[in-house]
Amino acid sequence: CIFMAGGPGSGKSFTAMEIFGIDKKLKSSFSSYGLKSVNSDSAFETLLKKNGIDPKHLARIEKEDAELWSKITADAPTVGTPLKIGILKRMQIAKGKSIRGRAKEITAKQKAFYEAGRLGMIIDGTGHRYDKIAKNKKYAESLGYDTYMVFVNTSLEVAQERNQNRERVLPDDLLEKSWKDVQNNLGKFQNLFGGNFRIVDNTVYKPIAKQVQKA
């Protein structure tokens, strides 16, 4: 079970493609190595488009339309929360839930089925909540998984620049807060994962170092 961490605009998709063979443009949920990709952003962007919302307009919506922003991002369940299959079968996505909340529920169901089959997973997230990662790591290990983390690092300035070119543009203040939270967790993650922790400097897009790929 591999945890990806790095703030918005850090280039996690590029790194996952380089290391694990995941093409972010593909609709499939697996890598060329057979690892299943768990990423609520894919479902989120799909649901945004189904609701007639251009992901590139999120930053503008956050500033200009508080009601719509709430419908998009109101409190959502945590994707990594361990859920048993029996519970998942009874779960239904309520019509009143936010788009982000619905995306996370879809992804949580997907993740639980992968876990039931003990399939290898790449859990793609920002890592801005240390307690969430620690909890999910412990749970994955209780299921028999070995756990690893790839931390994709970049400067705030580069992250902000890339954010403007992403399909889903985040508000500047949210991006900066997330970036700072992730940076504050860097040392904690190193201690948590020990020898199974790798940092990828992605300030400039370039081939991933061989020692990271071999790890």
Question: Where are the language model's segments positioned?
Answer:
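Conserved GTP-binding G-domain of TRAFAC-class P-loop NTPases and closely related GTPase folds
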Residues: 156-215
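Hydrophobic positions on the alpha1 helix immediately C-terminal to the Walker A/P-loop
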Residues: 15
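Short, surface-exposed connector motifs at secondary-structure boundaries
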Residues: 115-122, 141-146
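Conserved phosphate-donor/acceptor-positioning beta-strand/loop module used by diverse small-molecule
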Residues: 128, 141-161
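Short hydrophobic/aromatic beta-strand immediately N-terminal to the Walker A/P-loop
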Residues: 2-3
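Conserved substrate/cofactor phosphate-moiety recognition/catalytic segment
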Residues: 19-120, 131
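Conserved glycine(s) of the Walker
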Residues: 11
